[in-house]
């Protein structure tokens, strides 16, 4: 089997822009040479002021109609609490039928701020993981069978059929930041998603070994999977501007214990705004020099990630896309032999 090609994608900042502007940015990403566009699926954003949270499912359908070649997917959607897995199976089968070969379902265990505000219980991590595993198995069954009766611990179906589905099932990627979900991705998923800007040892000593372990236990090869790194990058010709742009996304620099149990965007915003700019920017590759920027990105290619999806924090995303299209993507493609 041929390994997936190296791809460079764009993360549409759904927590920062409304749906129409975000769709325009996705179209621009294709025009500037990006290979994919991924969107999160939040009910609520990380901050209240200036925050947005468009629904990913209608947005993907609309953007599919306005683009020609980019892969479109979620990074990530939680198919376990506010959605029944069967609803997600139907939605992505429809998207896959309309845009064959271009749709990816990226899933994860989720965030409490997207579930608790709807009056839904937020389970412990062990249950969230079990729900994710069961939901992926159910989605696979619904995509390959007919009149599916499923009796799981958390979900059930009774002679359910997804009537409209693509010739080839939509790939499922599992997002993870810990070993258990990463191992699960290696066992049952078509791809693995994680995020940049954390301790290097997390990738070298924990996540990648867990991924290889899952792949080997399933009798698969690692190069059968698409390994996607969501890259946190802030690139501008003005380094100070690149640094200050990270402020909007300061919540990403909060430690897990700092944001545990925080479901209100106003409270998340308050906590994030207390961080000094150096900490707010700590997850991001902040650069004004293209060669320096590419060299830092190269670290993740050297780890073996084959699909880098770039998430920029600034408010002027058209500027980012133009700068990346002109200065960064050509260097990256030359680096991997695509120039």
From Swiss-Prot:
Write the Enzyme Commission number(s) for this entry: 1.1.98.2
Q: For binding substrate, which residues are annotated in this chain's numbering?
A: 195, 198, 259, 283
For the biological process aspect of GO, one term held by this record is:
carbohydrate metabolic process
| UniProt-recorded Gene Ontology molecular function terms | coenzyme F420 binding; glucose-6-phosphate dehydrogenase (coenzyme F420) activity; oxidoreductase activity, acting on paired donors, with incorporation or reduction of molecular oxygen
**Catalytic activity, reaction form:** oxidized coenzyme F420-(gamma-L-Glu)(n) + D-glucose 6-phosphate + H(+) = 6-phospho-D-glucono-1,5-lactone + reduced coenzyme F420-(gamma-L-Glu)(n)
**One Pfam family named in its UniProt record:** Bac_luciferase
- Is the Signal keyword given for this protein? no
Q: Among its keywords, does the record have GTP-binding?
A: no
The highest taxon in the source lineage is Bacteria
Active site, UniProt feature: 42 (proton donor), 111 (proton acceptor)
User: Which InterPro entries is this protein grouped with?
Assistant: F420-dep_G6P_DH (IPR019944), F420-G6PD/mer (IPR050564), F420_G6P_DH-rel (IPR019945), Luciferase-like_dom (IPR011251), Luciferase-like_sf (IPR036661)
So where does coenzyme F420-(gamma-Glu)n get bound? 41, 78, 109-110, 114, 177-178, 180-181
Keywords, in A-Z order: Carbohydrate metabolism, Oxidoreductase
Which leading EC class covers this enzyme?
oxidoreductase
Binding partners and assembly: Homodimer.
Q: Which family does it belong to?
A: Belongs to the F420-dependent glucose-6-phosphate dehydrogenase family.
Sum up the protein's function in the record's words: Catalyzes the coenzyme F420-dependent oxidation of glucose 6-phosphate (G6P) to 6-phosphogluconolactone.
Q: What is this protein called?
A: F420-dependent glucose-6-phosphate dehydrogenase
State the species of origin: Nakamurella multipartita (strain ATCC 700099 / DSM 44233 / CIP 104796 / JCM 9543 / NBRC 105858 / Y-104) (Microsphaera multipartita)
């Amino acid at each position: 089997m041929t390994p997936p090609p190296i791809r460079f994608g764009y993360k549409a900042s759904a927590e920062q822009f409304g749906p129409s502007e975000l769709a325009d940015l996705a179209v621009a990403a294709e025009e500037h040479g990006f290979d994919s566009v991924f969107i999160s699926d939040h009910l609520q954003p990380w901050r209240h002021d200036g925050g947005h949270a468009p629904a990913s499912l209608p947005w993907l359908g609309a953007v599919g109609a306005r683009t020609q070649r980019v892969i479109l997917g979620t990074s990530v959607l939680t198919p376990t609490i506010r959605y029944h897995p069967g609803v997600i199976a139907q939605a992505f089968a429809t998207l896959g039928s309309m845009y064959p070969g271009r749709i990816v379902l990226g899933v994860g265990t989720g965030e409490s701020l997207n579930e608790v505000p709807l009056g839904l219980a937020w389970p412990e991590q062990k249950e969230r993981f079990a729900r994710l595993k069961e939901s992926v198995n159910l989605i696979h069954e619904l995509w390959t069978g007919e009149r599916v009766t499923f009796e799981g611990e958390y979900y059930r179906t009774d002679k359910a059929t997804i009537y409209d589905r693509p010739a080839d099932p939509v790939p499922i990627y599992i997002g993870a930041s810990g070993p258990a979900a990463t191992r699960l991705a290696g066992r049952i998923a078509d791809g693995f998603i994680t995020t940049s800007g954390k301790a290097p040892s997390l990738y070298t000593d924990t996540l990648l070994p867990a991924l290889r372990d899952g792949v080997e236990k399933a009798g698969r090869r690692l190069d059968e999977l698409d390994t996607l790194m969501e890259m946190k990058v802030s690139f501008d010709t003005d380094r100070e501007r690149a640094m200050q742009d990270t402020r909007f996304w300061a919540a990403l620099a909060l430690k897990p214990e700092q944001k545990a149990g925080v479901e209100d965007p106003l409270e998340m915003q308050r906590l994030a705004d207390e961080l000094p700019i150096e900490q707010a920017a700590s997850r991001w590759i902040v650069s004004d020099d293209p060669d320096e920027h590419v060299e830092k990105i190269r670290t993740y290619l050297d780890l073996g990630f084959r699909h880098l999806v770039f998430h920029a924090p600034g408010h002027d995303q058209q500027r980012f896309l133009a700068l990346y299209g002109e200065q960064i993507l050509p260097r990256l493609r030359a680096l991997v032999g695509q120039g």
